[in-house]
């Protein structure tokens, strides 16, 4: 005949509490181990996006003004003479440089979709050719053009715009100025048409 455990743990065994505690510890161990082995990207190299920046327009007044510094890959938002926001950006990559100069916001479109840059996709939604220029790249048979999404677009010169997009730590766009999500919203909401935009090298 087997002996029962000592009195100090007998209540746990009798009431099943020991099993419940062991089960909870095992579940916590399994759940916490999921983060130790993240799923790898399927293909390619994706550099980490840069930090978004900051925004504080409390007690700020005056007209909006945006300054983009290509060398720093930074954008600055002013109200009057007060700097109220700063963010990392990604400007035009080599061959697609963002033109320096003095401009103004001429139009805004929160849900803009490019008619020039995007992908050729088949009827099932599979991307056949990515990152294409529809003016130059021939469309493969059986595909259609799917324009790149450019949320919170503010156009300042022809097809050049500031908009939400992927912001790696280098110039990577087709000439537009990409901003991180929340900062694109802040700039869009606070820059009316006519806002001066200065792009410097």
Map each language-model feature to its residues.
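Exported/periplasmic cell-wall-interacting domains
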Residues: 2, 6, 34-41, 93-96, ...
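Bacterial N-terminal signal peptides
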Residues: 22-30
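Soluble periplasmic/extracytoplasmic beta-strand elements of cell-envelope proteins
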Residues: 65-69, 74-76, 88, 104-106, ...
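N-terminal post-signal-peptidase region of extra-cytosolic proteins
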Residues: 49-65, 70-71, 85-103, 135-143, ...
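Short, solvent-exposed cationic patches
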Residues: 101-117
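Bacterial Sec signal peptide processing site at the extreme N-terminus
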Residues: 31-53
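Solvent-exposed coil/turn segments that connect beta secondary-structure elements
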Residues: 71-73, 80-83, 92-94, 108-111, ...
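Bacterial N-terminal signal peptides that target proteins for export
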Residues: 4-22
């Amino acid at each position: 005949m087997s002996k029962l455990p000592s009195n100090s743990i007998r209540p746990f065994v009798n009431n099943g509490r020991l099993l419940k505690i062991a089960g909870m510890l095992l579940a916590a161990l399994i759940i916490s181990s999921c983060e130790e082995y993240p799923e790898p990207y399927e293909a390619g190299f994706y550099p980490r996006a840069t930090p978004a920046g900051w925004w504080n327009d409390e007690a700020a007044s005056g007209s909006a003004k945006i300054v983009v510094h290509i060398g720093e890959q930074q954008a600055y938002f002013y109200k009057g003479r007060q700097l109220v926001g700063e963010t990392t950006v990604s400007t035009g990559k080599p061959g697609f440089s963002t033109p320096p100069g003095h401009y103004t916001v001429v139009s805004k479109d929160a849900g803009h979709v490019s008619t020039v840059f995007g992908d050729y996709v088949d009827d099932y939604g599979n991307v056949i050719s990515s990152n294409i220029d529809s003016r130059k790249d021939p469309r493969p048979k059986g595909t259609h053009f799917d324009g790149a999404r450019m949320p919170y677009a503010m156009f300042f010169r022809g097809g050049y715009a500031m908009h939400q997009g992927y912001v790696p730590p280098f110039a990577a766009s087709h000439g537009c100025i990409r901003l991180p999500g929340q900062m694109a919203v802040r700039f869009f909401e606070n820059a009316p048409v006519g806002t001066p935009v200065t792009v410097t090298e």
